[in-house]
Amino acid sequence: MSTLSFKVLDLDFPAGSKNKTATLVTGESEALLVDAAFTRADGHRLAAEILDSGKTLTTVFVSHADPDFYFGAEVIADAFPDARFVATPIVIEHIQHSYEGKLKAWAALGPNLPTRLVDIEPLTGDLTLEGHTFQLKGGPDALPDRHYLWQAEHRALLGGVLLFQQEHVWVADTATPEARAAWIGQLDEMAFLEAELVVPGHRLPGTPADSSAISATRAYLLAFEEELDKAADGAALNDALVKRYPDNGMLIAAQIGAKVAKGEMKWG
């Protein structure tokens, strides 16, 4: 069986600010891509990475339904027409339901916006690459759209939207304490695996791809609950989070998440 290589690529989100990752996994002759970028430009950059690898792209796994996970997909599909795009059924449903609204929300991207949705096949089980199994894990009842991949031989965990490294954590889609508690439960499940490579869906470039992403995300979620109880409104909660995590990126996550948690804004 071949040995796999994992390359973590730092991409734009929002445009002009590198906070999103994609992961290119390569074997002897084939490649798997996890997540497909936020912009058409980054879609081209991913296509170039795949071409430079010299491997045949067989599968693209879209791990979540937010635009930074799939807006670049059409460029990759055009470059590699034989590659399969897969996602869990609920992620496909969310993408199809929200796509037009997300185009309007991110209209400032202009020509960097996608022009169409690619065909995405439902994934209900594990993925394989050259005989290596990537287990599809997660998706509890409280968070059915949140999965991650686990490759046991290489002790590699591709965490998607569940993991953040030195970023403000995106909590706007987990507006209740119950949802955030379920998230923490998934993080504890991840920690139990004792992974050696841990790829967060969002990170500041240069930060480590290891288990510290799990503990950092967990600590942030607990801090969010603590500051939420003390804050009078969304602005106060945002200020408290920024003060507590002055070096974290993705300030937009703190701003929007605080408003949603305080009932000042609806999201999704």
What are the language-model segments listed below?
Residues 34-36, 58-66, 86-89, 157-160, ...:
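Active-site neighborhood of phospho(di)ester-bond hydrolases with catalytic His/Asp-centered motifs
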Residues 48-126:
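Active-site HxH/HxHxD metal-binding segment of metal-dependent hydrolases
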